[in-house]
Structure formats: C-alpha cells, structure tokens
A protein has these predicted regions:
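Active-site neighborhoods and metal-handling regions in enzymes and metal-associated proteins
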Residues: 23-259
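Extreme N-termini of proteins with methionine-enriched Sec-type signal peptides or N-terminal signal-anchor
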Residues: 6-7, 29
Length: 259
C-alpha cells in the first residue's frame, strides 16, 4: 500500500502489438556489438531492476491518481523516465489503462479517459536501458472495492504459478504455456484477458530477430518448444504476461516480468 493505493506486489503486460511493424531510429540488431550469451540474462535482469525503480518513482510522485487522464500519466511517466533514469526510447508505447479500459490489451487503442476514484489502473512500460529492453506491467486499486483488490492480489500469485510450471519444463511449447495460464486464471475465478501470455525480450530491438514472429510469442499459435534457439541461434529470453479480467468484463489487471 502506497499513498492509500494498493498496488500489485513485486516478485523481485497484454501485448498484441505487431512488433514486426515497429521502426526505430537506431542501428539494426545485426549492426550492434555481439553480447556474450552468459551475460544476456544478467543484463536483462539488470534492466528489469531499473524499470522496477522507475515504478517506485512513479508511486513516489503520485502520478497515478484520480482526476488526471491516462494520456497525462503516460506523458509524465515519459518525462520522469528521461529525467531520472536517462531513458531515451521505449521499445513499445507507454500504456496506462483505467476503469473499463483495463480490460483492453496493448494492441487496442481505447479512448483516453480521466482516472476515477474507484478505478483499477494498470501500467505497462517498455523502457530501454542502454542496449537492453525491459518490460514491466503493474496494477493499482485506487478505491476500496474488494473484488478489485482481490484481482490485484491474485496477479503475482497466478504469475508465480505459471512461472513455476514453466520452470519444471522449459521445453514446453508456447501454446501449452498459454493454455496453462488461461486455466490458472479460470481456477482463480477470472478470465484470461490476453491473446498472448508473453513474448521475447532481448537487446534492443527484439523485433529485428529473424524468424516467424508467431514463434516468439506465448500463444495458441506457437507449437514450438520455448527452449528452441532464436533466429540468430541464441537462447531465447521470455516475458510472462498475466492479464486477469473480471467474469463480467467490467475491469481487469495486468502484471508482467521476466519468465
């Protein structure tokens, strides 16, 4: 609980964005200096830790509060990330979704709305720290609604359950892990809101890794082992996304971290 707001507990996102369509004014991945395989996970974990500190600063400054629009919060987060963390680019758009917009996924573009006093709000950020992508999703309850509090409390618990299942068998397919995540959400009393349950993350930009992009997502369309190497022959590093939605579709919450 911070400033009277309950937020998703940390364990130290639904992206339907077509990453293949993204463009950046940066060198292609093939032009970047290669990174040693044994350091890549360490660097991604360091980027995630920095992103979590960015969330700490967002909460410190009270950016998520009633009376401001989602777009205003997105803009202020961008300013904060640049000012205090030196973030010059984000590999995906900054996402703030509140109230009925909290059931939407990253690829949606719902109308901007003003955050209200009893809202649930989720934030999904993809800052790039030096060469490394982070991807963090976190949810907040602004009021006292017990169902919203229960959903936000369930997010990291369901995440941990799905993560533990994967770690028992890293060779499972993306489709199998998606199905498990969907079933875990249902067992907790929620709908699984995402078309995917995660995706690759890497040196910026993972969208430039060669190969079929469907195989780089945790989704029903990925029948291949998640332990397979990527299109450059390297280990794949995954983000796990948990998007829980109320059975009546009135609100949802989002949580993501490295798998």
């Amino acid at each position: 609980m911070q400033g009277g707001i309950l937020c998703t507990p940390d364990l130290r996102t639904n992206s339907a964005i077509d990453l293949g369509r993204a463009r950046w004014s940066t060198p292609a991945m093939s032009d970047l200096a290669p990174f040693a395989e044994d350091t890549r996970r360490t660097e991604l974990e360091a980027a995630q830790a920095k992103a979590l500190r960015l969330f700490d600063a967002i909460e410190r400054d009270g950016l998520i509060r009633p009376g401001v629009t989602e777009r205003e919060v997105q803009d202020r987060i961008g300013e904060l990330a640049a000012r205090e963390f030196g973030v010059e680019k984000h590999w995906h758009k900054r996402i703030v979704r509140s109230g009925p917009n909290s059931i939407t996924i990253a690829g949606d573009n719902p109308p901007d709305r003003t955050i209200e006093a009893d809202d649930i709000v989720y934030v999904d950020l993809g800052p790039v720290f030096e060469a490394w992508e982070a991807d963090i999703g976190k949810s907040y309850v602004l009021g006292k609604d017990p169902q919203k509090h229960r959903l936000v409390a369930d997010l990291p618990r369901v995440f941990a359950e799905v993560q533990a299942h994967y770690r028992k068998d890293p060779g499972m397919t993306g489709a199998a892990l998606y199905a498990f995540a969907r079933d875990a959400a249902a067992a907790a009393g929620w709908r699984f809101g995402g078309k995917i349950a995660g995706h690759l993350v890497s040196e910026f930009a993972h969208a430039l890794i060669p190969g079929d992009k469907a195989l780089y997502r945790i989704s029903p369309e990925n029948p291949t082992p998640m332990s397979d190497p990527d299109g450059k022959g390297r280990a794949r590093h995954w983000i796990l996304e948990i998007h829980l939605v109320a059975p009546d579709g009135s609100f949802g919450g989002f949580y993501e971290r490295l798998l």
